[in-house]
Amino acid sequence: NENDTSPPDGILSLLQRTFARSFEVHPLVSQKLVQQKQQRLRLTNNQMRLLDYINNRRRAAISGGAGTGKTLLAVEKAKRLANDGFKTLLTCYNKQLGMHLESICKGIDNLEVKNFHYLCSSYIQKFKKEMNRDLLQEAKDSYGMQNQFDVLYPVALSYAADSSNFQFDAIVCDEGQDVKQSYWEPLELLLNDYDNGPLYVFFDDNQNIYSREKKFPITEEPFLLKDNCRNTSQIHNLAYKYYKGDWIDPPQNMGAKIMRIHADTLESQVKKINMEITNLITKEKVSPDSISVLLLNGEYKEIYYNIFEGLPLPKPAKLQIEWIQGVNDVLIDTVKRYKGLESEIVFLCGLDGSENGALDDLIYVGTSRAKSLLYLVGKERICNNILS
């Protein structure tokens, strides 16, 4: 047909092969993180119903595995008590967790947030200034030169209860399994109603990496959180291989598979981690503060830190070592110090020594810190052993 302007069959076939090839567009990692965050928010809102259920209880222990929302619920309970007019203390054992809780609760009336030992030291200083009493010296006079953190600080804190100005109407404790038995008495003494003052303890039986005896000043059976609302199911399934306790329902969000970076030396591990972090920030548009590097075994942490400090990150990202993570910070820390916290993406390294089962509790804690994406970094044999 002389009016037919379509290209000849040969040219048409060539055009189709060249321009009509099927291809697949993969969403950026940053986009996946946003989607998974929305899914977690819906699950966490369901967990909040527990707070309504225990609203009329003056004291309660709430138990749950990693990712069940214990810290979020502890913060929300403390905020509700403070908003209801209770002078409230939100406390924990871990220093890093304490700083995190303090930062997200800043400016809330009636709410004081401090980890246990910071609470002790600040009260010792405050009491000396306002009451002209040296509580630490009084503790030394009574108990001699015993361990400052395990004996003298708790004793000094109990002495502070002599003044009603230093007492609270209610106390909420997160990660209660890490609080030593000898710390509970001074905490209870800080309640202006020793017998009936509101006291809520959130804990995880399996995260007791400090090997504390778990006896809380609460007689009723604990309430159990059963839904994992932090991790993907891939991360959940790995972390809960190392969990001993009540069944926790895995999330429905499958998520990405566990990533592995194989390297035999510390230096090569760090270099490969740095390359992948650079890729996540530059190509996948991931915010630096969504990335954390955690050392399972902190024995060689200074070596890791020194190597990391010598490698560049794409600006404005910078490395933050053992401190609060800012908006442009890639954090590096140990699993023990990072306990109770979470990150969208976690690189878990320092895996040496994990094969004999001695670090199983730390593997549970370390892997479960990752919300969306988890990298295992180390010798191939060790990574395979953790995944097997």
Regions found by a protein language model. Name each.
Residues 122-149:
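Conserved P-loop NTPase mechanochemical-coupling segment
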Residues 15-19, 23-24, 47, 207-208:
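N-proximal short alpha-helices
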Residues 1-19:
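Accessory nucleic-acid engagement/destabilization modules that flank
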Residues 141-169:
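Mid-core helix/loop region of P-loop NTP-binding domains shared across ATPases and GTPases
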Residues 40, 45, 51-128, 150, ...:
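Conserved helicase motor core of SF1/SF2 NTP-dependent helicases
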Residues 18, 22, 127, 131, ...:
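Short, flexible helical or helix-coil boundary motifs
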Residues 20-43, 63:
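Conserved adenine-nucleotide phosphate-binding loops and their immediately adjacent elements
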